[in-house]
A protein has these predicted regions:
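Conserved beta-alpha-beta core of the PfkB/ribokinase-like small-molecule kinase fold
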Residues: 13-82
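Structural motif
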Residues: 12-13, 98
């Protein structure tokens, strides 16, 4: 695995997501991030509790806890967009560059390294299948970031991708994402 990771080049993006298989060490994400420190790559971490907290010292570009995972880290219950902000800031203080917090029907919050906080309610639509919506949000955020290097654009693109995925039986189409993104932009004017 490490030999494959060594092939990453400047400008690449590495996603570390989910739980670690039992056949691997518990600190695998930390080991990977330590090894990648010298490379100019963006690392995204979407993991729970200790897996997430233990990599913060390596300054991942983006982490994406949901409000329940964030609350679990700090031993609190977080239900509103406003309530997650202080705890997202604590994760930034611990080393995360950007913290994207998904909140299902409540929408999402981005606490960005430019010290801006972006908040948006959930998109309007019928929930069909929430499986993979968080992963779609992360992928959409990074796609928006790579194309624009603008946090608001990346945030809205991520939210649109996650929402479109939740409103679809399988993965959303590009048109479904674009329709939701246009709806969100129209509402913010």
């Amino acid at each position: 695995l490490m030999e494959h990771l060594d092939r990453l080049e400047d400008g690449d993006v590495l996603f570390l997501a989910g739980s670690i298989p039992a056949s691997m060490p518990d600190d695998m994400y930390s080991r990977i991030m330590e090894r990648m420190q010298h490379k100019n790559i963006e690392i995204v971490v979407d993991a729970t509790r200790d897996l997430l907290v233990n990599v913060l010292k390596y300054h991942p570009f983006l982490i994406k806890p949901n409000n329940h995972e964030l609350g679990d880290i700090f031993g609190v219950e977080l239900k509103t967009r406003e309530s997650v902000i202080p705890y997202g800031n604590r994760l930034r203080d611990m080393g995360a560059r950007n913290v994207l917090i998904s909140m299902a029907g409540e929408g999402a919050v981005l606490i960005a390294e430019n010290n801006e906080v972006y908040k948006a309610p959930a998109s309007k639509g019928k929930l069909v299948n929430a499986v993979g919506a968080g992963d779609s949000m992360v992928a959409g955020f990074m796609s928006g970031w790579i194309k624009s290097h603008d946090y608001e654009t990346a945030f809205l693109t991520g939210l649109a991708c996650g929402s479109a995925s939740a409103f679809s039986e399988y993965l959303a189409t590009g048109k479904e994402v674009e329709d939701i993104l246009n709806q969100m932009k129209g509402e913010s004017k």
